[in-house]
Amino acid sequence: MAFVLSLLMALVLVSYGPGGSLGCYLSQRLMLDARENLRLLDRMNRLSPHSCLQDRKDFGLPQEMVEGDQLQEDQAFPVLYEMLQQSFNLFYTEHSSAAWDTTLLDQLCTGLQQQLEDLDTCRGQVMGEEDSELGNMDPIVTVKKYFQGIYDYLQEKGYSDCAWEIVRVEMMRALTSSTTLQKRLTKTGGDLNSP
């Protein structure tokens, strides 16, 4: 019994030690959740995207900001968090519930919430307590404007099935970009300036 307790204690220490302290957003669990959320979004497909071509719109995904080198190290975590929070907010609405299979939608919202909780666990550790006011950060404002454009589009289209299908495809792009950012952070140990 003492051996088992020692082993468990060692595992806890390793997970909170230098190797495990790269920040919760770099965890393997977060990457698995991200892949599962993309898989769920793919399964939510109800219409052929080709039948909705007339409703296409360029929402202006700040892809080069998320996937490129435009983000500073201290901006990457807040941008990732904001992308996930806005995605959750989009799918956790009454209009969304009416548009999608509720089982898949609930699983997606649960997965996004899990990612947010994982990120929130070390929010202060990664950003510093003094940096927690992020509303004025330019990249965050860019992400918020991007999602506001999606909300405006859905409202303009009367939350039609085709509008939701276009948004579903767009959200796959957005979450793929955020996953790319997570991978970059994982490869560099949180330092975006590393080669």
Swiss-Prot record:
Principal cellular location given in the protein's record: secreted
Matches recorded under CDD domains: IFab (cd00095)
Annotated compartments: Secreted
Zinc listed as a keyword: no
Keyword annotations from UniProtKB, A to Z: Antiviral defense, Cytokine, Disulfide bond, Hormone, Pregnancy, Secreted, Signal
Domain of life, source organism: Eukaryota
Gene Ontology BP terms: defense response to virus; female pregnancy
Protein task: Paracrine hormone primarily responsible for maternal recognition of pregnancy. Interacts with endometrial receptors, probably type I interferon receptors, and blocks estrogen receptor expression, preventing the estrogen-induced increase in oxytocin receptor expression in the endometrium. This results in the suppression of the pulsatile endometrial release of the luteolytic hormone prostaglandin F2-alpha, hindering the regression of the corpus luteum (luteolysis) and therefore a return to ovarian cyclicity.
Name of the protein: Interferon tau-8
Organism of derivation: Ovis aries (Sheep)
Lineage of the species this protein comes from: Eukaryota, Metazoa, Chordata, Craniata, Vertebrata
